[in-house]
């Protein structure tokens, strides 16, 4: 659920009420909760303190199965946010989005490894290709990460029409 599209996301009671409604409607289906900040391609900005409060509300609700925590805006707070989610029994997707380019393979692997070392259950990268070679760069990084850390599943995607093959 993309909470950045929820108008009352900053209202703790409204957010908790909405999460309980989603949990009831979904039954046994998994609920992934995401607040995608504007800096990472989302609907609205959210200060770091507000983002942490959002994560706390999600964790306290007992409704989420997975929580997506953004990597770069929260890098210093990441281990604490992940520990909070894990203490609540919530798996963590740690995400990074680059809408301008595809960084080199080594940087992509470094990012995913840093996410894993911070405690993320599922590192996630979404990057923008400028060429077919960029798509292959992401796929090579994905292969290297899964070879180095087979215990950690990863989510990677190359965006746009050019990256479609990476999203099969």
Regions from the PLM with identified roles:
Residues 1-87, 93-104:
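Active-site beta->alpha loop and helix N-cap motifs at the rims of alpha/beta catalytic domains
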Residues 66, 71-168:
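Catalytic alpha/beta core domains of metabolic enzymes, predominantly
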């Amino acid at each position: 659920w993309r909470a950045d599209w929820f108008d009352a996301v900053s209202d703790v009671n409204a957010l908790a009420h909405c999460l309980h409604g989603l949990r009831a409607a979904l039954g046994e289906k998994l609920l992934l909760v995401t607040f995608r900040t504007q800096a990472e391609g989302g609907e609205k900005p959210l200060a770091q303190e507000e983002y942490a409060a959002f994560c706390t509300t999600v964790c306290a609700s007992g409704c989420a199965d997975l929580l997506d925590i953004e990597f770069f805006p929260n890098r210093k707070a990441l281990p604490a946010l992940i520990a909070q989610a894990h203490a609540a029994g919530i798996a963590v997707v740690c995400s990074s989005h680059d809408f301008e380019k595809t960084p080199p393979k080594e940087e992509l692997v470094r990012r995913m490894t840093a996410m894993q070392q911070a405690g993320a259950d599922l590192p996630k990268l979404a990057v923008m290709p400028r060429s077919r070679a960029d798509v292959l760069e992401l796929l090579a990084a994905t292969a290297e990460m899964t070879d180095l850390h087979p215990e950690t599943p990863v989510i990677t995607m190359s965006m746009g029409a050019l990256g479609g093959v990476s999203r099969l």
